[in-house]
Amino acid sequence: MIKKIITTCMGLNNGLALFGVGLIAIAILVTYPKLPSLDSLQHYKPKLPLTIYSSDGQVIGVYGEQRREFTKIDDFPKILKDAVIAAEDKRFYDHWGVDVWGVARAVIGNVMAGGVQSGASTITQQVAKNFYLSSERSFTRKFNEALLAYKIEQSLSKDKILELYFNQIYLGQRAYGFASAAQTYFNKNVNDLTLAEAAMLAGLPKAPSAYNPIVNPERAKLRQAYILNNMLEEGMITLQQRDQALKEELHYERFVQNIDQSALYVAEMARQELFEKYGEDAYTQGFKVYTTVDTAHQRVATEALRKVLRNFDRGSSYRGAENYIDLSKSDNVEETVSQYLSTLYTVDKMIPAVVLEASRKGVQIQLPSGRKVTLNNHALGFAARAVNNEKMGDDRIRRGSVIRVKGSGDTFTVVQEPLLQGALVSLDAKTGAVRALVGGYDYHSKTFNRATQAMRQPGSTFKPFIYSAALAKGMTASTMINDAPISLPGKGANGKAWNPKNSDGRYAGYITLRQALTASKNMVSIRILMSIGIGYAQQYIQRFGFKPSEIPASLSMALGAGETTPLRIAEGYSVFANGGYKVSAHVIDKIYDSQGRLRAQMQPLVAGENAPQAIDPRNAYIMYKIMQDVVRVGTARGAATLGRSDIAGKTGTTNDNKDAWFVGFNPNVVTAVYIGFDKPRSMGRAGYGGTIAVPVWVEYIGFALKGTSVKPMKAPEGVVTNGGEVYMRERMTTSSDLALDNSGIRPRPTQPARRAVPNENRRRAESNTAPAREESDETPVLPSNTGNNNRQQLDSLF
């Protein structure tokens, strides 16, 4: 009887086993054909960040959520490959995708635990999960994972599978793949890892957070020891190597991408262009973008701008703490402060610090290095009054305040970032390539790019476009214009009269067009615009690249009352510099894919080749010659310190000295400088273009043109010289004889018309207006009438 029972049971077991095998076979037959294609593995394209470079190959920007560096499996060191295999899959080179013995152990453990608590995922199974499956803990998912692992093993070599794993696996700290992890945790190339470091990294795949050596050093050390012991058991290392690795003290160094900080505004401009072209793929396809800027030029431009902004801010009162963090609820103040400071940048040698204690005796701060320093009243300097000053509210210096200090060793002083801002744009005049661009004092504190986004009044820097229109309309550099006061009843604010003036209160009477621009005479600019017509001027000035919205349809145009950007102004002046051609500013030169293949290359419009002719080359040349006088004897005399005879330019200052400009150029380079507060307010007596913008330009262009030969613009065909003045040939005997009074081009009524004597007029104007002083351009409130009708209405007002 007992024998029958045993026989029956054995039969039942065999039957059940066969039944189970049958079910598994059916499941495999049903599921296997539905498994996903392996195209994504066979043509692996990891998510690689967008990297932006300067023209000289320096990294200026990296964008992308995943920090990854694709590396071929043969380029990984053997100690790392051994460590990972010892940790994750000892029989990797022996199984067919699934480790049967490992599965058996895991099944027993899960049955004992009453659910899926652990797996026996091989490296191949992990590849299947990472690329295709979720992290759900279920038997169904594990079954699909096993089938997919088998399919992968049938299609790919072991080394290819290992390569996929080594590059795709997430290892914490935004690091994907072991090459990236080596940089992230040890700031090393993967081939420079020691055995101890390799074993530590090999412990991360199991649980990147739990075994993070920076956050959980003790657990990470236990995991490292486990892996080293496995390596010893597998004969991968010797006992001596294991013991030495266990004793090795590891030094963790957070990876900091070596990004040149001077070109961050340019990098952001390039990023925006890539995003517009490729969308989110811009951040995952590993594009390498080479820009047109040179890092040496960028650094000089940045420092030139910062120096002027710092000097202006010197003497200002302390405006208060930069920020505040609540330390009252922190269990570990030092760690809380360290983590916060790690998110901030040192700007212009101004180091961020957090106040730990604040009293009359002094202020204790913690630096990003973790070092604590006490500042006495002398070190606090102008910030001493802010210590626990309740009147300053949240801006006071107290425990938790974020401040800036400068210094080294034991000597630090409190400093603050300037409130005044500015921008610099330098273009290749012939192609529009941006050679340097600075959008503000510091990108990290304010990402707003004043070079491209700040719509500000250009002031007198806009006048050359109107003067160019006048030349196109028939005037010459020696046309006489009356520099006298003008009053327009009812055209000012609140219906009052508009009484524009020259800022120095001086009026020179009849002077030449050349002299008027050299001395930046507001009254002359207004009369010129009245003569040529507002409508004509609007249409003409669009040739320089300005949008209609940037050109006001009123006489205020003559004083630069419209709003535009420094970049647009620089583009406009490039027309004068290159002989009359319209070129487009651009920052991207070439785009490569992750394999180093050229995907796109800028084909710029080049002056004299394929760029459209915006204005008559003779017009551009005459304007260049006139603006050389602005540098020689006019409002930009500071630029003459360079000692170059090929420089020309124009300054600009708006109402109450709220905006200051200088745009200078030679036939090869155009550079515009803008200075002003983000919330417009007066800069005071120091806020003229000639006094605050010109010094920035001089320091930068002195470097940019160092070693280059002096080559003034050559006169184009059709330009003649008479009496020291330059003319278009056909106008030598016509309009150059005339003078412009209040109503247009005609002989002055007070005396017969005569040919102007340029040298005589120039000397007279210089004596009447010297020393030239920058004009502050009054902005009127005028109706939007345009063209000759407007001029005829104004004729009766004089």
UniProtKB/Swiss-Prot annotation:
EC numbers, comma separated: 2.4.99.28, 3.4.16.4
Substrates-to-products reaction catalysed: [GlcNAc-(1->4)-Mur2Ac(oyl-L-Ala-gamma-D-Glu-L-Lys-D-Ala-D-Ala)](n)-di-trans,octa-cis-undecaprenyl diphosphate + beta-D-GlcNAc-(1->4)-Mur2Ac(oyl-L-Ala-gamma-D-Glu-L-Lys-D-Ala-D-Ala)-di-trans,octa-cis-undecaprenyl diphosphate = [GlcNAc-(1->4)-Mur2Ac(oyl-L-Ala-gamma-D-Glu-L-Lys-D-Ala-D-Ala)](n+1)-di-trans,octa-cis-undecaprenyl diphosphate + di-trans,octa-cis-undecaprenyl diphosphate + H(+); Preferential cleavage: (Ac)2-L-Lys-D-Ala-|-D-Ala. Also transpeptidation of peptidyl-alanyl moieties that are N-acyl substituents of D-alanine
Feature: compositional bias, Polar residues: 782-798
Gene Ontology molecular-function annotations: penicillin binding; peptidoglycan glycosyltransferase activity; serine-type D-Ala-D-Ala carboxypeptidase activity
InterPro entries assigned: Beta-lactam/transpept-like, Glyco_trans_51, Glycosyltr_51/Transpeptidase, Lysozyme-like_dom_sf, NA-bd_OB-fold, PBP_transglycosylase, PCB_OB, PCN-bd_Tpept
Pfam family name, one: PCB_OB
Pathway the protein contributes to: Cell wall biogenesis; peptidoglycan biosynthesis
Region annotation (Transpeptidase) ranges: 413-699
Region of interest (Disordered), ranges: 734-798
Active-site residues, Swiss-Prot/TrEMBL: 88, 460
Periplasmic topological domain: 31-798
Keyword terms: Antibiotic resistance, Carboxypeptidase, Cell inner membrane, Cell membrane, Cell shape, Cell wall biogenesis/degradation, Glycosyltransferase, Hydrolase, Membrane, Multifunctional enzyme, Peptidoglycan synthesis, Protease, Signal-anchor, Transferase, Transmembrane, Transmembrane helix
Membrane topology: Single-pass type II membrane protein
Location in the cell: Cell inner membrane
Transmembrane segments: 10-30
Cytoplasmic topological domain: 1-9
The organism's place on the tree of life at top rank: Bacteria
GO biological process: cell wall organization; peptidoglycan biosynthetic process; proteolysis; regulation of cell shape; response to antibiotic
GO terms for cellular component: outer membrane-bounded periplasmic space; plasma membrane
Keyword Membrane: yes
Transglycosylase: annotated segments: 50-218
Role summary: Cell wall formation. Synthesis of cross-linked peptidoglycan from the lipid intermediates. The enzyme has a penicillin-insensitive transglycosylase N-terminal domain (formation of linear glycan strands) and a penicillin-sensitive transpeptidase C-terminal domain (cross-linking of the peptide subunits).
Family: In the N-terminal section; belongs to the glycosyltransferase 51 family.
Name of the featured protein: Penicillin-binding protein 1A
